A protein has these predicted regions:
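C-terminal His-loop and adjacent cap/lid subdomain of alpha/beta-hydrolase
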Residues: 1-112
Length: 112
């Protein structure tokens, strides 16, 4: 889970991470969820619990069933007092990671 307006650890890192996971052949294990908010890890408690439910469902069923942002927002909203701000799950595709990064153990640089 990542905020779209994170200036400390930019969301483009998620695109770089996906590239590494995909090249390792494990893309089927990775799901990325984004929250439309500024700041680093500025998730509400309700958003955090909702994302945890998605992960727990994956462990229980062996399958990813990531609901739409609207469904995630509805689940978070149902948690009442844990919403210190309106739920803000969103569809988001990070921009390409423009800096080369090294894939550990392979001694080569990758570009997103």
């Amino acid at each position: 889970m990542h905020t779209t307006g994170d200036g400390l650890v930019v969301p483009e890192n998620e695109q770089a991470y996906r590239s590494v996971v995909d090249r390792a052949g494990h893309g089927y294990l990775l799901r990325q969820i984004f929250v439309a908010r500024a700041g680093h890890c500025t998730f509400t408690p309700a958003e955090t619990i909702t994302a945890l439910h998605v992960r727990l469902n994956r462990l229980d069923t062996g399958h990813w069933n990531v609901p739409s942002p609207a469904d995630l927002n509805a689940e978070a909203a149902s948690l009442g007092a844990l919403n210190v701000a309106p739920p803000a799950f969103t569809s988001y595709r990070p921009a390409p990671y423009l800096r080369p990064f090294d894939l550990p153990g392979e001694g080569r640089f990758l570009f997103g």
